[in-house]
Curated annotation (Swiss-Prot):
Classification via Gene3D superfamilies: Vaccinia Virus protein VP39, Winged helix-like DNA-binding domain superfamily/Winged helix DNA-binding domain
Family, as annotated: Belongs to the class I-like SAM-binding methyltransferase superfamily. Cation-independent O-methyltransferase family.
Keywords attached to this entry: Lipid metabolism, Melatonin biosynthesis, Methyltransferase, S-adenosyl-L-methionine, Transferase
Residues engaged in binding S-adenosyl-L-methionine: 153, 170, 216, 246-248, 263
Region (Disordered): 354-387
Cross-referenced InterPro entries: COMT-like, O_MeTrfase_dom, Plant_O-MeTrfase_dimerisation, SAM-dependent_MTases_sf, WH-like_DNA-bd_sf, WH_DNA-bd_sf
Residues that coordinate or bind substrate: 267, 317
Catalysed reaction equations from the record: N-acetylserotonin + S-adenosyl-L-methionine = melatonin + S-adenosyl-L-homocysteine + H(+)
Protein name listed in UniProt: Acetylserotonin O-methyltransferase
Amino acid sequence: MHRGRSASARQERDFRALMDLAHGFMASQVLFAGCALRVFDAAALGPVDAAALARSSGLSPRGTRLLLDACAGLGLLRRRRGAGPRGPAYTNSPLASTFLVAGSPLSQRSLLLYLAGTTYLCWGHLADGVREGRSQYARAVGVDADDPFTAIYRSEAERLLFMRGLQETWSLCGGRVLTAFDLSPFRVICDLGGGSGALARMAARLYPGSEVTVFETPDVVAAARAHFPPPADEDGAEPRVRFLSGDFFRSPLPPADLYVLARVLHDWADAACVELLRRVRGALRPGGAVLLVESVLSPGGAGPTRTLLLSLTMLLQARGRERTEAEYRALTARAGFSRLRLRRPRGPYHAMMAARGGGAGARSDGGGGDATSQTGSGTGSEVGAQD
């Protein structure tokens, strides 16, 4: 009898765990809908009730009440005790106040909207992606493109949403990866595929003695200049960052002491990564180095779970995968770099630095591998990016 009861209790626990996994997409959609409908922005102004929010936002009263209750159940909102004539009132939880309100310094709203409108749709075709071994943009968003960024940047609105999402990611954890190593000896820094320039501007603030350049595609550079003006520091000065446009698989790369590749290599297969690293090494000055920012798998590739899921995202949205430290060490060595070192700052990303070295791996031409065009900033769905 005791064994039977234990087995039954274990089965109940396993079934609950199974249902939590099966229903996980529902929780994601509650989060996404709350952001899209600006529920958390409304609650930031004061307690909200379903009837008033529905009326002011043009929503159905029934749907609004159900969504607010679900947000409260997930810990995104707090349902106040007691109910007035229009039903219960809701306020933001600390999590929502910090990460889900559009005006918060650490808001991740744009990132979540990007996940909802692109990554979530691709994940609906995971079985197809596993069968075919290729991205699922054609099924998910109707764009059948060899270059993943053609799909991500399928409209100017989507381009800006993606760039804002990356900017939000770096606002949360950019400083940690940029201070994992002391970058002050590097006087000229180039952020390859640096998007809006958020990480580059952070580097310029942290290392005021360095000149920082963002190398991006022409369309991204134009969008960065038009829509992402540099914030002034406390003394009113703007961090000095310049933008150069080009294709990092084809165009000449500017000379630098340090190249930063943040969430870039995970987009690409090994051959393209080696080709890009060789191009970077060819542009580095003597004594230079490359800083890689990635979510690194544990030895053997068995975890962490979040990084394993990100690797599937790369199957569905790009051509690459997440890798172990040993795999990054092998890639950099094939490109001629030496002494790869890994640091694990608090947060979702790891920082790796490899020295330019003096071997024969450098090559300054832009062809080879399976690289056909520049990806720009990593597709990382960072996914928030929580550990």
